[in-house]
Design a protein with these regions (language model features):
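Conserved binding/catalytic microenvironments
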Residues: 2, 6-300
Length: 300
């Protein structure tokens, strides 16, 4: 059971990185069928086969992440709750922390920034966190603080996240810390600053993150860049970005990304000061997006 669960984790992570969360959904459904413990209908007894329960906890964490990025928030809540239950049973504090960090992001996406802050606070323990993990906590807190309107606090937190990131990796970091890299941090720095309307600083950071090579889920930074350009009134840059995004929009496998793109494009179409050429480009982008995202952005 443990090797099988571990192989499933590897397969799901690879699918998500290469093709996105929506492409990974069929494999998620198979995993839920193959491992009934993930559904919550059965609970492994405490203290029994700790390695097996830890593998199931990690699998449930990955499932929760994919469901979130695929836009299935209710199911993501369930998977995260299940992962947390399993980590309690096996004592896997690192998978528990990663699940809490994922859930904090989900809560911010659902306009629950106070809940996000409470969840992020649960990541701490009796010992100081490794730098990369602490950086992630600070990133989650910065996003939530920005949504709450705490401009000074959000800036302080995202600056502190950069400082902690620069402290580097250590032997105390969990195995999943590899994906917290420079481009991930750049994207979140830009995104937090865009939430605050600090376009002069946000746009270059988002552009660097959006144009860097990386896994599929980082298309989100390109979507956030378009949303920021639209809000900043940077029409020429928005037109250039749409020209780059539209040919590959149909293949984006993240519902978060396609919804953000659809929202930005829809706003550009309705804008009273938006040039006609940009409105046409925004309409074209909507046509290129997967149908559910395009439909959700169109006025009723």
């Amino acid at each position: 059971m443990t090797p099988s669960a571990a192989r499933t984790v590897e397969r799901l992570v690879a699918l998500d990185a290469a093709r996105g969360a929506t492409a990974a959904l069929p494999a998620v459904r198979r995993a839920l069928r193959d491992f009934p413990e993930l559904s919550g209908d059965t609970t492994p007894p405490r203290g029994r086969d700790v390695d097996r329960v830890a593998a199931l906890a990690e699998l449930s964490e990955v499932v929760g992440w994919i469901l979130f990025d695929a836009g299935l928030h209710r199911q993501a809540h369930r998977a995260n709750a299940r992962a947390l239950t399993l980590t309690e049973l096996c004592g896997d504090r690192w998978t528990q922390r990663l699940t809490l960090l994922n859930h904090s992001m989900l809560q911010t996406a659902e306009a629950d920034p106070r809940g996000s802050l409470e969840t992020a606070a649960r990541v701490a323990g009796p010992r100081p966190l490794p730098a990369r993990v602490d950086s992630l906590v600070l990133i989650r807190q910065a996003h939530a603080s920005a949504v709450l309107g705490g401009r000074r606090e959000a800036r302080r937190l995202i600056s502190r996240a950069r400082s902690r990131f620069l402290d580097g990796l250590s032997r105390h970091d969990p195995h999943w810390a590899w994906w917290i890299d420079e481009n991930e941090l750049l994207g979140h720095e830009g995104w937090v600053l865009a939430r605050l309307g600090d376009w002069d600083r946000a746009l270059p950071l988002l552009h660097r993150a959006a144009t860097a090579p990386g896994p599929s889920y980082r298309h989100l930074f390109g979507a956030e860049l378009l949303a920021a350009l639209a809000r900043a009134g940077a029409w020429t840059e928005a037109l250039d970005l749409i020209a780059d995004l539209a040919p590959r929009a149909a293949a984006i496998g993240s519902a978060r990304t396609t919804r953000t793109l659809a929202g930005a494009a829809s706003g550009l179409r309705r804008g009273t000061r938006v040039p006609a050429s940009l409105k046409d480009a925004a309409a074209h982008l909507l046509e290129c997006l997967p149908a559910p995202a395009a439909r959700s952005a169109r006025p009723a």
